[in-house]
Amino acid sequence: MARDLFSRYIWLIDTIRRYGSLTRDEINRLWMKSPYSNGEPLPRRTFYTYRNAIEELFKINIECNPSTFEYYIEQS
């Protein structure tokens, strides 16, 4: 279970880095094609939980641009 969760965090980080910035809908479409989704969408609450865990574990901030509603990884 923990290994699978860790893999999901890595998938989210890698996906946002690869594309630069993505809306929640775009993340969801890519998520549904991933091996972690079982064909199910990524619930909003789960996305925010993953986002917070990623910040806590990896010190990586996934920010949202309020004008475009796109998520991106804040460069430090």
What kind of region is each of these model predictions?
Residues 1-76:
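Short, basic/aromatic recognition patches that contact phosphate-bearing ligands
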